């Protein structure tokens, strides 16, 4: 197989790049023409490394598992200036995360999506807690969303998986040897995110 397109998290395509180099294979021999990257934050520096090494177009793709997964919005290879939202299927809004007030296009706030064509499980004004703003269309007529700047809650995205501190706390509380006091250390090692949880032990805990 010689695929033209790969759909992947940016950290994994960089890990693939490292494997090419480890095996002394020129990544430019790959058949890839487009790398659709999403499910975790990535930077313009990461895009540049992907494009300079593999020689494909690296474009940003945004999705929500609660709505459709990947494909709520996608960058165009012509402009690469932010994902265009598929407004035929999703109605986007940006609100003030504190008050819920709808903000005009161009102002930063929390994204809100309503599905327009989903039949089995329509979703109305879903708040994914992602912070961005709506911008005019460029290469496509549909509006763009700026790259997500952060979140209005404390969720972490690790290798494309949503991780909440409350989930970690739930596991800790099941162990009677551990106190409910912990620190989460999130770092990137060799392209991939890693989590270390430092937990206090109870004074009366048996080793």
Spans of model-derived segments:
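Active-site glycine/GP-rich loop and adjacent strand/helix microenvironment
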Residues: 1-207
């Amino acid at each position: 197989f010689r695929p033209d397109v790969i759909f992947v998290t940016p950290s994994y395509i960089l890990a693939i790049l490292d494997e090419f180099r480890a095996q002394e294979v020129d990544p430019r021999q790959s058949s890839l023409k487009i790398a659709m990257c999403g499910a975790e934050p990535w930077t313009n520096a990461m895009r540049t490394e992907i494009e300079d090494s593999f020689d494909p177009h690296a474009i940003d793709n945004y999705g929500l598992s609660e709505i459709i997964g990947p494909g709520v919005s996608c960058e165009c290879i012509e402009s690469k200036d932010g994902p265009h939202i598929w407004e035929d299927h999703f109605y986007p809004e940006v609100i003030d995360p504190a008050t819920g007030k709808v903000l005009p296009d161009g102002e930063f706030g929390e994204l809100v999506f309503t599905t327009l064509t989903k039949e089995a499980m329509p979703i109305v004004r879903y708040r994914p807690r992602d912070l961005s703003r709506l911008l005019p269309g460029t290469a496509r007529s549909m509006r763009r969303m700026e790259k997500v700047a952060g979140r209005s809650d404390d969720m972490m995205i690790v290798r494309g998986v949503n991780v909440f501190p409350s989930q970690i706390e739930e596991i800790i509380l099941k162990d009677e040897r551990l106190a409910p006091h912990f620190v989460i250390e999130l770092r990137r090692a060799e392209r991939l995110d890693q989590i270390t949880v430092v937990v206090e032990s109870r004074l009366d805990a048996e080793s």
